[in-house]
Amino acid sequence: MSAQMQSTPETFPAFCEGIQYFADSFPEIDRLGAEPLLGPDQPALPDASSEAAIYQTLLAADALRYLTLQVTGAKSSGHPGGFASSADAVAALHLLGHRNMVTEVGHHAPGFYSAMFLDTSLEDMGIHTVSDMRTRFRERHGLLGHLSGAIPGLLAPAGPLGQGQHFALAGAYLHRDKLFPVTIGDGGLGEPYIMSAFQHFATAYPDVTNYLPVLVWNGYSQEHHSMVSLWDNGRMAGYWRAHGFDEVHLVDARDFADTPDAPVYADSTTFGFAARMAFTGAILKAADAASRSALSGRRACLIVKQLKGAGVHATGAK
């Protein structure tokens, strides 16, 4: 993501009104971004492995990060860093057509509001432009600091750590032909409720698997630091398998870094264009595979490991 301020374009879509900074044109935009792959008659990517699908997922992830900054900056309030680590996974699942997404991370509210803005859900409450969204953030008549299930497009509230999976499990039980992803943060994973809930549900309803935990593993948390920062990939994957998950789809940003000195928790947004495409392609492939398995009777989870604050902080959120 560019930090350079550019002049305002002569023309831009009406919903962009209120955006304060514009970057140079994204690489390959004319070849891979000229025509949207999604539309009124195409709610999901027709081919998740295509170069255009990967490219447009990358654009969506950066759009989510940028809008999150716009929203939090408007009122000098909110937490953009945590959601930024999950933006790639959220974008991938949305473009794959899986939009019944909940979270246990109340601080991710600005990112989820940004997703609802991009899919036009917020138009039902009179939010049509970026300026509208900035104005209505952190207002009683608008977008609350923590998620509210009363916001169009959102299925459930979020706030207390470790509580979001209950909503995903309930949705999966009631609507077994749909996928219910739930994003889980580092802090939330340290709460006992999450794995306990998954275990109890699997015991009671072993045939209901259409939920997908999405762990945002970024190495920082307000609590439970030892668990999130000291484990390696093998131990993390083993932890989920030990709790009965059939498949663990783990994508580590460091594996795609184009510099030899990438830290353990790498920031994918600092990679070159080719490396960013490779990382996004891996996210999209893993999200697609995990989703298909969850909808086919196998317990699956998706783990994305990268630096907290990826793309919205100069050196990550600490």
Annotate each PLM feature.
Residues 2-119:
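N-terminal amphipathic, basic-rich helices that act as targeting or association modules
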Residues 6-9, 131, 234:
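Generic detection of intrinsically disordered/low-complexity segments and helix-coil linkers/edges
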